[in-house]
Amino acid sequence: MSGLLKLLMMITVGCRTSTAHRRDPSGAAFRAAWARCLGLCILLPCPAIAATPVRIVAAENFYGDVARQIGGADVTVRSILSNPNQDPHLFEVSPSVGRNVSGARIVIESGADYDPWMAKLLEAAHGAERQTIVVAALVGKHPGDNPHIWYDPSTMLVLAKTLAADLAADDPAHKSAYERRLGRFEASIQPIEARIAALRGKFTGMPVTATEPVFGYMFRALGMQVRNMAFQMAVMNNTEPGASDVAAFENDLRTQKVRLLVYNSQATDPIAMRMQQIARQSHVPVIGATETEPPSQTYQAWMMSELNALDHALAE
């Protein structure tokens, strides 16, 4: 029992005792005593009632990470896709995931057909009041575009600003805290931008290739010339690349027309593995890129790690 509650009980007992030994047919003395007791209760300090954190559900953990960095202790975040050893394209929705979405105040999805299962979850939870952020829509991307938009750090800056504004609207008591954390997030992206600028000075125009367009937006930021896009899009869409596209890819590797091969380390198939083998036989550097943020890393550390791996591979 709290000290405040004990004190209130003592006051109440005292008030009753002070009037019990006297006869007061009108009850005036009793009412006056209670008024004095209530006055004391009003003057006593009361413990503050903690605000309920804003519940956020993110389809992917890199968006959940940004939400956590902006929201801090004022939010709770659940990320649906968070296992870097799982192929995101094979994800299946479970009832527990649906329950989490239905209770969220803010939902973040990637859009551009990367996580189409989110639309079904939101439709099933149609009665709830929530704010839905579609990141692809924030940056002008649509179905048919490369959906791996988080590999462009500017995308995450746009998301962070949107989150800070939405959280401030939903929870105005902590508006200044959200704005302060947004400022820290923006500052933390600057080293990534500086690293990209430095690497762009070294690698602009360099021909590179990939088994899927996971790293595509980062390639573009680095000024690299990306080849074999028809092959990459076919693999991403789980369709068989055309024979001419396969032949062109193999030729680029065997003749070293490309300086680097990036593969999706979360989604491998026989033809992608074959390209890796040919690249290694042809002494073309090979690095893996993940679609999902690795555990115990922030988005910032993850992107810096990917950039360092690219720089190291090309320096060999």
Name each model feature, range by range.
Residues 18, 38-40, 146:
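Residue-level detector of alpha-helical transmembrane segments in integral membrane proteins
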Residues 1-32:
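N-terminal secretory signal peptides that target proteins for export/translocation
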Residues 27, 47-49:
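Intrinsically disordered, low-complexity segments enriched in proline/serine/threonine
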Residues 35-47:
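Bacterial N-terminal signal peptides
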